[in-house]
From Swiss-Prot:
One GO MF term attached to the UniProt entry: channel regulator activity
Family: Belongs to the SNF8 family.
Protein's recorded name: Vacuolar-sorting protein SNF8
Coiled coil region boundaries: 27-53
Lineage: Eukaryota, Metazoa, Chordata, Craniata, Vertebrata
Length: 258
């Protein structure tokens, strides 16, 4: 027996049903979007009330400030996005991170002749705290990272390089690719690295290792020690702390400014 073909009426009915399902789906999606938008507005209002109530604690307590920033991030609010507006006027965070950014630049410039423009986050944190004095608003490493990201967005040459369990802060516009970053990570343990160590650990050819090290030397990020036993050592001054035993004075920071 031959199967009967589907009639025009059945096809039209099927298309009508599909159109209704599609229309219903659109209505549901719009309802969900409206509900989410309403919840988001309510959450933002509650966040503003929370900020108003706890603004002193947000400004003074670094840990509390981190938690507040995370709360803001969940709804896409960035208190640092502008120097003006509700958040900066209420909390003063715009001015806080602007001033912190200026201080970071001053410290990095003052130390540039020692470290070539690379400094660990821990060392930067210590130097910033020294410069602020004991009566100034407390600053956390998270605050530093947020301020540096703002500096980076301005095209100032600042960057953040993950190294082991910490970060190196780059304050010069040197171009560093993945090879350079891997070598910096390798040098973290001793503060220096050799061509042989790179070849053994990373399985690189000699020329590749030399090119990376020569670039770091050229950018002033590494020092070459030809008197070291065995073979030349390439020291990364940002990774050893003997150079930072002296506190940076205010005069030294000012002299470093252009």
């Amino acid at each position: 027996m031959h199967r009967r073909g589907v009639g025009a009426g059945a096809i039209a009915k099927k298309k009508l049903a599909e159109a209704k399902y599609k229309e219903r789906g659109t209505v549901l999606a719009e309802d969900q979007l409206a509900q989410m938008s309403k919840q988001l507005d309510m959450f933002k209002t509650n966040l503003e009330e929370f900020a108003s109530k706890h603004k002193q604690e947000i400004r003074k307590n670094p840990e509390f400030r981190v938690q507040f920033q995370d709360m803001c991030a969940t709804i896409g609010v960035d208190p640092l996005a502008s120097g003006k507006g509700f958040w900066s006027e209420m909390l003063g965070v715009g001015d806080f991170y602007y001033e912190l950014g200026v201080q970071i630049i001053e410290v990095c410039l003052a130390l540039k002749h020692r470290n070539g423009g690379l400094i660990t986050l821990e060392e930067l944190h210590q130097q910033v705290l020294k410069g602020r004095g004991k009566f100034a608003q407390d600053v956390s490493q998270d605050d530093l990272i947020r301020a540096i990201k703002k500096l980076k967005a301005l095209g100032t040459g600042f960057g953040i390089i993950p190294v082991g369990g910490t970060y190196l802060i780059q304050s010069v516009p040197a171009e560093l690719n993945m090879d350079h970053t891997v070598v910096l990570q390798l040098a973290e343990k001793n503060g220096y690295v050799t061509v042989s160590e790179i070849k053994a650990s990373l399985k690189w050819e000699t020329e590749r290792a030399r090119q990376v090290l020569e670039h770091l030397l050229k950018e002033g990020l590494a020092w070459l020690d030809l008197q070291a036993p065995g073979e030349a050592h390439y020291w990364l001054p940002a990774l050893f702390t003997d150079l930072y035993s002296q506190e940076i004075t205010a005069e030294e920071a000012r002299e470093a400014l252009p």
